[in-house]
């Protein structure tokens, strides 16, 4: 989860998020090197008084500054495409969770089980218990098993929403009349927080998401308690 005055990403809790963090560091290093080179060239231009008045063209330099950016773009594009394909890859899911966005709450349906669905509203600040997080707690948490592939089906009943959980590297738009799909998998039990990430009206800021990821045995016990 996030911490006060945090500048970096949240800790990765899924393989996809780990790949995204590696790609971010890879791209940031390239940007840093290019920025340093540009600043160095600018500083040379500002501090030197030498000028090559007889130089009309420099084909070697033009060749280098055409080929080098192309190579850099390829070094950025290939890892990016790899992660995009990983995010869209759908294996045989062990569980399917249907998510519907509303103004301004979420509803969830475990489609593999009959009559297992509920709405999830934000807990008002006046009802929070000690240790609970303001604007992030909900009355009904999503409970999911760890180490299993979970398919998320995401849509909306009214306007555009976006179902996002940063620690899991998931952000999928909820669009009325359209069913989007995402895959979740994590080996780390815990409670993970997210929020609606698409401006959807007056109470957009009050649509938190809470996932409680537990071992399979505890998930089965939770299922029995829901019937």
Swiss-Prot record:
Mg(2+) binds at residue 198. It catalyses: 4 Fe(II)-[cytochrome c] + O2 + 8 H(+)(in) = 4 Fe(III)-[cytochrome c] + 2 H2O + 4 H(+)(out). Its cofactor is Cu cation. Cu cation A2 binds at residues 196, 198, 200, 204. It holds the Pfam family COX2. Residues 46-59 are mitochondrial matrix. The keyword Protein biosynthesis does not apply. Keywords: Copper, Electron transport, Magnesium, Membrane, Metal-binding, Mitochondrion, Mitochondrion inner membrane, Respiratory chain, Translocase, Transmembrane, Transmembrane helix, Transport. Binds a dinuclear copper A center per subunit. Its EC number is 7.1.1.9. PROSITE patterns: COX2, COX2_CUA, COX2_TM. CDD domains: CcO_II_C. The chain crosses the membrane at residues 15-45, 60-87. GO terms for biological process: ATP synthesis coupled electron transport. The keyword 4Fe-4S does not apply. It is a multi-pass membrane protein. GO terms for molecular function: copper ion binding; cytochrome-c oxidase activity. Component of the cytochrome c oxidase, the last enzyme in the mitochondrial electron transport chain which drives oxidative phosphorylation. The respiratory chain contains 3 multisubunit complexes succinate dehydrogenase (complex II, CII), ubiquinol-cytochrome c oxidoreductase (cytochrome b-c1 complex, complex III, CIII) and cytochrome c oxidase (complex IV, CIV), that cooperate to transfer electrons derived from NADH and succinate to molecular oxygen, creating an electrochemical gradient over the inner membrane that drives transmembrane transport and the ATP synthase. Belongs to the cytochrome c oxidase subunit 2 family. This is Cytochrome c oxidase subunit 2. The gene is MT-CO2.
């Amino acid at each position: 989860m996030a911490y006060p005055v945090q500048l970096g990403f949240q800790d990765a809790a899924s393989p996809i998020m780990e790949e995204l963090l590696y790609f971010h560091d890879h791209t940031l290093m390239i940007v840093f090197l290019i920025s340093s080179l540009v600043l160095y060239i600018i500083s040379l231009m500002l501090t030197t008084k030498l000028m090559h008045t007889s130089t009309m063209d420099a084909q070697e330099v033009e060749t280098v500054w055409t080929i080098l950016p192309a190579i850099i773009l390829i070094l950025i594009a290939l890892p990016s495409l790899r992660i995009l394909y990983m995010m869209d890859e759908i294996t045989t899911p062990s569980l399917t969770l249907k998510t519907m966005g509303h103004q301004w709450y979420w509803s969830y349906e475990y489609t593999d089980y009959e009559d297992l669905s509920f709405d999830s509203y934000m807990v008002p600040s006046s009802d929070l218990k000690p240790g609970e997080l303001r604007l992030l707690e909900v009355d009904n948490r999503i409970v999911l098993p760890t180490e299993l592939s979970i398919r998320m089906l995401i849509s909306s009943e009214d306007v555009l929403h976006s179902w996002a959980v940063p620690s899991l590297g998931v952000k999928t738009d909820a669009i009325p009349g359209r069913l989007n799909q995402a895959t979740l998998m994590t080996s780390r039990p815990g409670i993970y927080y997210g929020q609606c990430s698409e401006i959807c009206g007056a109470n957009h800021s009050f649509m938190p998401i809470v996932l409680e990821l537990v071992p399979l045995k505890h998930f089965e016990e939770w299922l029995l308690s829901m019937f």
